[in-house]
């Protein structure tokens, strides 16, 4: 018998480095990487039933109802790649009601990784971000400055990358996370995200490796 595949949820505030870690996890563990936002865009582009319904809400400037998104997530998790190789659910659920909807469908992860980065570092990471309108490349004034003066002179800041906007986004994020804690409290693992990319991944890798080991032991003992 094959071991039960890995099922992982990951969450992190804006600029916590979650996107980078997801890429590393996906590459090493071959998990189906599922982001609700990407799913939503794909379904809308494909003109599916869920996509059409979601689009109606978005065009009115309203939030897409939980049931539509949960449906999309459920259908995606039923695809063969997610069933066979396991899955990485990225930045979802975001609220207690979304978590409950997944629980009702018996969709439960082995672990819920919470990337923990101090607020002042998150703010610094976001506020220092700059966009090169010519190439679309993202720079950071401190961590990855532009190669030359010419590029430096044309860099722009995205309108929602201001300190005020970041702090609002963080506030919303923390409220959302707070509401999830009760559902996942015994499987939440906080990983300090203020180290280097490799150091953060080493901790995640160790965690996922030990979960897989336990799953394999269970198979060999039955």
UniProtKB/Swiss-Prot annotation:
AMP binds at residues 41, 62-64, 91-94, 98, 158. NCBIfam families: adk (TIGR01351). The keyword Transferase applies. It comes from the Eukaryota. It is found in: Plastid, Chloroplast. Its EC number is 2.7.4.3. Catalyzes the reversible transfer of the terminal phosphate group between ATP and AMP. Plays an important role in cellular energy homeostasis and in adenine nucleotide metabolism. The maize enzyme also works with CMP, albeit with 10% of the activity with AMP. This is Adenylate kinase, chloroplastic. It holds the Pfam family ADK. Keywords: ATP-binding, Chloroplast, Kinase, Nucleotide-binding, Plastid, Transferase. It is an enzyme of class 2 (transferase). Belongs to the adenylate kinase family. It comes from Zea mays. ATP binds at residues 15-20, 129, 195. SUPFAM superfamilies: P-loop containing nucleoside triphosphate hydrolases. InterPro entries: Adenyl_kin_sub, Adenylat/UMP-CMP_kin, Adenylat_kinase_CS, P-loop_NTPase. Monomer. One of its GO terms (cellular component) is cytoplasm.
């Amino acid at each position: 018998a094959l071991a039960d595949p890995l099922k992982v949820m990951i969450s992190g505030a804006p600029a916590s480095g979650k996107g980078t870690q997801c890429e590393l996890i996906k590459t090493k563990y071959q998990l189906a990487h599922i982001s609700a936002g990407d799913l939503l865009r794909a379904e809308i582009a494909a003109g599916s039933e869920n996509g059409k319904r979601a689009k109606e809400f978005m065009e009115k400037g309203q939030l897409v109802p939980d049931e539509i998104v949960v449906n999309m997530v459920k259908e995606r998790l039923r695809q063969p790649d997610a069933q066979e190789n396991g899955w990485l659910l990225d930045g979802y659920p975001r609220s207690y009601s979304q978590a409950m909807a997944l629980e009702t469908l018996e969709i439960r992860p082995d672990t819920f990784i919470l990337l923990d980065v101090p607020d002042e570092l998150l703010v610094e990471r976001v506020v220092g971000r700059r966009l090169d309108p010519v190439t679309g490349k993202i720079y950071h004034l401190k961590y990855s400055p532009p190669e030359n003066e010419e590029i430096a002179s044309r860099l722009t800041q995205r309108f929602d990358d201001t300190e005020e906007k970041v702090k609002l986004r963080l506030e919303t994020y923390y409220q959302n996370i707070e509401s999830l804690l009760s559902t996942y409290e015994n499987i939440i693992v906080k990983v300090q995200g203020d180290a280097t990319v490799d150091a953060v991944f080493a901790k995640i890798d160790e965690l996922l490796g030990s979960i897989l080991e336990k799953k394999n032991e269970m198979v060999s003992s039955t």
